[in-house]
Amino acid sequence: HACTGYKTVLFFCCLLFWAPIMGQKKLADAPKIAPALLIKDLQTLHKILKQNHPSIYWYTPKDSMDFYFSSALASVKDSMSVWAFKNVVASYLAKIKCGHTSVHFSPKLTKQYAKYRFPQFPLQLKVWKDSAVVIGNIYTRDSVLKRGTIITAINQLPIKPLVDSIYGIMSTDGNSINFKSQVLTNNFSSWYKARFGDADSVYQISYIDSAGNSKTSSIAAYVPPKPKKDSLSSTTAAISKPKLPKPAVPKKWTLFIDSSANTAFMRVTSFSGSGLRKFIRQSFRTIKTSGVKNLVVDLRENGGGNIKNSTRLSQYISDHAFKIADSVVASNRGISKVPFSNFFNVVYYALAKSVISKKETDGKFHFKRFEKHYYKPIIKNHFDGSVYILQGGYTFSASTLFTSPLMNQKNITIVGEESGGGYYGNSAMMIPKIKLPHSQLLFRLPLYRLVMDKTRPKGGGVMPDVLVDPSSYAIKQGFDIKLETVKKMIQQKN
C-alpha cells in the first residue's frame, strides 16, 4: 500500500528528527489532575453528547451508553495525567460507534507532551483481522524483525487480544473494524504507547521465521541518543554534516494514463482542497482525449472531505441522477450545554444550523437540500467505460458518499476490502471541536446524522465486489496486491 509505505517512512523520519531536540521523560512523570476536575469534564462531555449528538444511540442503546458513562466515572479513582484520562474519554466515545466522534490533544497539550514522546515501540506493523506483519523497524540493521515478518505476540500477549485492546480506544462507524486496523497500521508505535504506556525498556516479540517456525526475539524500546555535551563539536558537526533531503510529500490527487493498458489511473487521497474540482474537470477531459476505456479510481488513502467534491466526482461516472441521502437530521437547531469558553469554536456551526435546518413532523431538524436535490450526471467528458474503485479500511466518510450512488451500476466494480466508512450512513456533517475545560482535551462533535439509503442494513461498511485481503507475502515482496488484481482483471477483459 503506497499510503502505508509513505507514512511509515515519514513516521521514522519524524522520530529521528525530533529525537535529539529535547530531554525525554516517562509518562509516569507527567503532571496529574485531581479526580474531581476530571469527573466534571466527563459530566460536561456527557451532557453535550446527550443534547447535541444526532447518533449517540444509533448503534448503542441509551441504557448501555449510561452504563458506559458510569464505568468511565468509576475509572477515575485518583489523580490522572491527561494522557491517561484521554484513554478514559476515548473508550467512552468509542461505544457510540461513530468514526467522526473522537478525542484529541489540543495544540497546547501536544506541545506539552512532546517531552513524553519517547521511549517508543520500535516496530511499525500492518494489522488486519488477527494478523500483524512488520512494515518498518527503527533499527534498520535488524536482520530478524524485517519487513514481511509475521508477528504473533508482543510481551506474550497474542496479537488478536492486543489489537482488540487498542481498538477499544478507537472510534469507527458501526461494527466494522477495517477503519481501526488501517488507522492503527498508519501509526502502530504511537497507538501501542497510548494503550500500554512506556514502562518497557525491552519487548519480547514472538514471530514466524522464514522456515515457518515460531520464534521469540528481544528488541529494545527506541530511546533517542542524548546530545553531546561538547556544544562546540556539536555545532561544528551540524555545520559540516550535509542536510538530509526531506521525503517528498505525494500529491493529494494524481492521474496517470497507460495507453498500452487502455486505462487511466486516478488516485484521490482526499476530497478536501480548493483545487480538487479543477483536477476532476481536467482529468476527465484528459481521459476523454486519450480514449481509454478503463478507469481505476484509488480511494484507499481517502479519509473523506468535502461532500460537494465527492459528489462532483460521482457525477462524471454515474449513469443516473442521484441524491446524497434519504435523510440528514440534527437533534436541535443550535448547539446546547457547551461551556462558554467554547463560544468561538461553535458559533459558526450554531448559526449555520439555524439557517439550513427545518423542523419536520418527526421532531428532528432536517437539511432538506441533500434529502431532496437530485444531482444529474455531467454530460461533457462523462466516462462511460469500465470503472474499478479501489477501497480499503481508510476509505471513509465522503469516500463512501462518492461510492454510494455507483454501487449497482453495471460498469462499476469495487475491489479491495470492506470500507471503513458506513454503508448505511454516517455523522459526517458539521463537526466542531469542543474543549473540555479542566483537561483541555478536544473532542469532535458531529451535528448531523446522514442516512444514505434507509433500506440498507446498518453496522458495516461498503463491501467490495472483488475481495482482496492484505497478504504477508505481498508486503514482504513490496507489491500492491489490490492494484495488481485490478490490472489482471483489465488484462483478461481486454
Where are these regions (language model features)?
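Bacterial Sec-dependent N-terminal signal peptides
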Residues: 1-28, 45
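Short, well-ordered alpha-helical microsegments
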Residues: 20, 276, 398-399
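Flexible, low-complexity junctional segments that flank or bridge functional domains
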Residues: 24-295, 299-329, 423, 428-436, ...
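Conserved acidic, small-residue-rich alpha-beta core segments centered on
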Residues: 149, 307-475
